[in-house]
Amino acid sequence: MGFVKVVKNKAYFKRYQVKFRRRREGKTDYYARKRLVIQDKNKYNTPKYRMIVRVTNRDIICQIAYARIEGDMIVCAAYAHELPKYGVKVGLTNYAAAYCTGLLLARRLLNRFGMDKIYEGQVEVTGDEYNVESIDGQPGAFTCYLDAGLARTTTGNKVFGALKGAVDGGLSIPHSTKRFPGYDSESKEFNAEVHRKHIMGQNVADYMRYLMEEDEDAYKKQFSQYIKNSVTPDMMEEMYKKAHAAIRENPVYEKKPKKEVKKKRWNRPKMSLAQKKDRVAQKKASFLRAQERAAES
């Protein structure tokens, strides 16, 4: 069929149907969402959990959610801006930070359900493929599915860093190694050591060393926060190892204390009935006293 020009006449506008709001805004891929949300009909009211990963300019958001008619219900959430608490003060949007955020989400969720001692996950970071399996006589492994949204799911995307962190943390998420850094599409082989380097921030450390030698000014400009926090390339691996251990030790979210706000009143408050009656009585008494004084004089 050749090119057909759309004739925008009365019939076109009369029959025009707008797309969903979040599709118009370019926020939701409804083709993917439909498949992620719909549960098997023989599972009745069992929720189908999704691991949602979104990368913004300054943060990485990881959530476990399930869909309801009223809207999505968030079961648990973890953010990259929480990582300074665990010792990672810089590079909060790189691959290593995505891994830490995914790990934090998994440990926090399992801790909430009392399964953190049953499913420890992979404590030693190898970068190799690892899958969580249910243990006999214990609650089954928590299963969810990756929701990458509209992110381009290319090999090495940070979304898969968060996925790997969650899997190593003890969640059962179906995946393969094809999208992890270290996978070669030509030879169809996966190099786990390359992946481990990314998890430990060694790709960033190598670039820091390269810039230090080649262009000092560019290094100072690009890694100003690293310099400010005294983070050197040699410290990176140890920093992330300590962060992983700290996350496993205490993944619980601590609520910030609510600020007490003293309300200022800009107008006079309304008087009660008793106050109004008292005011009238005072005015009457004052008026009568004035009348008496006038009569005496």
UniProtKB/Swiss-Prot annotation:
GO cellular-component term (any): cytosol
Region described as Disordered: spans on this chain: 253-297
Covalent cross-link Glycyl lysine isopeptide (Lys-Gly) (interchain with G-Cter in SUMO2), where: 220
Stretches with biased composition (Basic residues): 258-268
Domain of life per record: Eukaryota
Entry annotated with the keyword Cytoplasm: yes
Illness the protein is tied to: Diamond-Blackfan anemia 6: A form of Diamond-Blackfan anemia, a congenital non-regenerative hypoplastic anemia that usually presents early in infancy. Diamond-Blackfan anemia is characterized by a moderate to severe macrocytic anemia, erythroblastopenia, and an increased risk of malignancy. 30 to 40% of Diamond-Blackfan anemia patients present with short stature and congenital anomalies, the most frequent being craniofacial (Pierre-Robin syndrome and cleft palate), thumb and urogenital anomalies.
Protein's name according to its UniProt entry: Large ribosomal subunit protein uL18
The organism of origin for this protein: Homo sapiens (Human)
Name of the gene: RPL5
